[in-house]
């Protein structure tokens, strides 16, 4: 049985471990491959290179899951939207402003997404059988906000002003992205992904009414559509920064796994783990410190979630400046805890 899926089968005696952005800039072997391709999106579509970097952290650390190397913005890019990645700046997109802009979006995605599915098939062939393969997409609100802002990591005034003032158009764009996201996830499962994940990086900027409309409702639609085709494929949802709205999300969205950020109290994680599998939530900055601090913070999480439906991960992605030896230490510590979790002196 695949380790990452163990909690889904009621087997919670072992703690599965993997990390968001586990294939990335903190790895010297990743940097070496990344330097061979100037354009980031071209790198994401390169079957050989994306396969190689997907497998790198598995070879180095033996995580319980590999997550396909891709990006949440490959979907709008494959649908014809202008997306570019500028070094030291991040994604730059054509800004969606009016009904006229729908003419730049294609009903059917172009060949680029086929490259993503090829990567999944290739990784699946090379991945050791006990290890799960995770496919993913950006959740509609996060992808939509990139399109409305024209760039990432803003204060989201533009996006929020747009959805307040243009309710019908905003809903039309949301529905379009929701439908295409579900299709993208279904195709990833068809290609061999064992688990699927939805990243809603910017869900935390919305008030409750908008959170319901732009996060809860589309996520629910996507999951129901995927489950019609793949009822047994586990789905992880990560409405990052949702705060108190995590509880509303759990109540209204039929997810298998809830990924949570580092701001969520351990008591809440324990409580929620009776309803769903909880994934998280070590602060990524802890991995920039030292072994004693890593051990202290990790132990608290493992003790709190002992015997619970739980997958160990970070509260967000591994930071580029993270020392590889700290990732190794953390992984080994979690493994050692598994072996000795009945020993009260551990």
Swiss-Prot record:
Protein's name in the database: Uroporphyrinogen decarboxylase
Pathway, per record: Porphyrin-containing compound metabolism; protoporphyrin-IX biosynthesis; coproporphyrinogen-III from 5-aminolevulinate: step 4/4
Residues carrying the site annotation Transition state stabilizer: 71
PANTHER family (UniProt xref): METHYLTETRAHYDROFOLATE:HOMOCYSTEINE METHYLTRANSFERASE RELATED, UROPORPHYRINOGEN DECARBOXYLASE
Organism: Rickettsia rickettsii (strain Sheila Smith)
One GO MF term: uroporphyrinogen decarboxylase activity
UniProt xrefs under PROSITE patterns: UROD_1 (PS00906), UROD_2 (PS00907)
Record's subunit section: Homodimer.
S-S bonds: none
Alphabetized UniProt keyword annotations: Cytoplasm, Decarboxylase, Lyase, Porphyrin biosynthesis
Gene symbol of the encoding locus: hemE
EC number of this enzyme: 4.1.1.37
């Amino acid at each position: 049985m695949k380790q990452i899926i163990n909690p889904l089968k009621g087997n919670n005696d072992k703690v599965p471990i993997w990390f968001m952005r586990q294939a990335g800039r903190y790895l010297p072997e990743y940097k070496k491959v990344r330097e061979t391709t100037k354009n980031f999106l071209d790198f994401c579509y390169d079957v050989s290179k994306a396969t190689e970097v997907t497998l790198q952290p598995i070879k180095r650390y033996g995580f319980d899951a590999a997550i396909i190397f891709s990006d949440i913005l490959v979907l709008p890019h494959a649908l014809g939207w202008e997306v570019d990645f500028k070094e030291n700046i991040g994604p730059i997109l054509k800004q969606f402003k009016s009904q006229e802009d729908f003419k730049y979006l294609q009903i059917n995605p172009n060949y680029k997404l086929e490259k993503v599915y090829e990567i999944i098939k290739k990784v699946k062939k090379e991945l050791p059988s006990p290890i799960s393969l995770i496919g993913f997409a950006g959740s509609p609100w996060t992808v939509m906000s990139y399109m409305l802002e024209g760039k990432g990591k803003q204060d989201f005034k533009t996006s929020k002003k747009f959805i307040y003032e243009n309710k019908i158009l905003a809903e039309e764009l949301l529905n379009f992205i929701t439908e295409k996201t579900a299709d993208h996830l279904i195709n990833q499962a068809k290609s061999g992904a064992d688990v699927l994940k939805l990243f809603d990086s910017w869900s935390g900027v919305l008030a409750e009414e908008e959170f319901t409309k732009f996060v809860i409702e589309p996520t629910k639609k996507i999951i129901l559509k995927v489950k019609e085709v793949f009822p047994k494929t586990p789905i992880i949802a990560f409405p990052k920064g949702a705060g108190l709205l995590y509880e509303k999300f759990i109540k209204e969205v039929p997810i298998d796994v809830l990924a949570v950020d580092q701001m969520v109290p351990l008591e809440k994680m324990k409580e929620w783990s009776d309803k769903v599998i909880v994934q998280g939530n070590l602060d990524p900055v802890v991995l920039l410190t030292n072994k004693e601090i890593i051990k202290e913070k990790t132990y608290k999480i493992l003790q709190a979630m002992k015997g619970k439906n739980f997958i160990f991960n970070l509260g967000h992605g591994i930071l580029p400046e993270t020392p590889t030896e700290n990732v190794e230490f953390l992984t080994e510590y979690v493994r050692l805890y598994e072996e000795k979790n009945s020993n009260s002196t551990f």
